[in-house]
């Protein structure tokens, strides 16, 4: 069933903030995510608290990114993703509320890790974001494993 859901839909987004505040729900999800990460040694994780919570202690991560985008640009992009089915004003309000609640959440609030690479997505297009990420990944992996490092 979950494979047929659009996890980035407004309907799902409306419930995420409420669920993210529930300590027990976060614990269950964290255990599930850590299990998947242990099973797959090379994995790319995406989420608002992957580096600060899920990967914080063990297993360690090679590269972490913290994406920052101004509310106006983020709202427009989300509105286009939703095929303009919801008023832009509502999308903007929803994003503002979710970000504020995530940052002020008692358990594992949204924050940038000290070693995370900040990427300002409001001033870059997708291609530029990917190029910047790729450059940072190469730099970190070469620094950690040496110039002869080759991904499997």
For the regions a protein language model found, what residue spans apply to each?
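Short, well-ordered beta-strand core segments
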Residues: 43, 61-66, 116-118
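Anionic group-transfer/hydrolysis microenvironments
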Residues: 48, 68-70, 122
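Conserved phosphate-donor/acceptor-positioning beta-strand/loop module used by diverse small-molecule
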Residues: 58-80, 93-96
């Amino acid at each position: 069933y979950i494979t047929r859901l659009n996890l980035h839909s407004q309907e799902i987004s409306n419930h995420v903030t409420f669920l993210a505040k529930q300590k027990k729900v976060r614990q269950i999800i964290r255990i599930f995510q850590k299990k998947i990460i242990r099973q797959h040694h090379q994995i790319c994780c995406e989420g608002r608290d992957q580096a600060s919570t899920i990967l914080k202690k063990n297993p360690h991560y090679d590269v972490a990114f913290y994406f920052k985008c101004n509310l106006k640009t983020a709202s427009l992009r989300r509105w286009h993703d939703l095929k303009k089915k919801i008023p832009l004003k509502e999308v903007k309000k929803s994003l503002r509320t979710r970000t504020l609640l995530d940052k002020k959440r008692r358990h594992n609030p949204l924050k940038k890790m000290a070693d995370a690479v900040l990427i300002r997505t409001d001033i870059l297009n997708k291609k530029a974001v990917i190029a910047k990420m790729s450059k940072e990944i190469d730099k970190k992996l070469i620094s950690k494993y040496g110039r002869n490092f080759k991904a499997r």
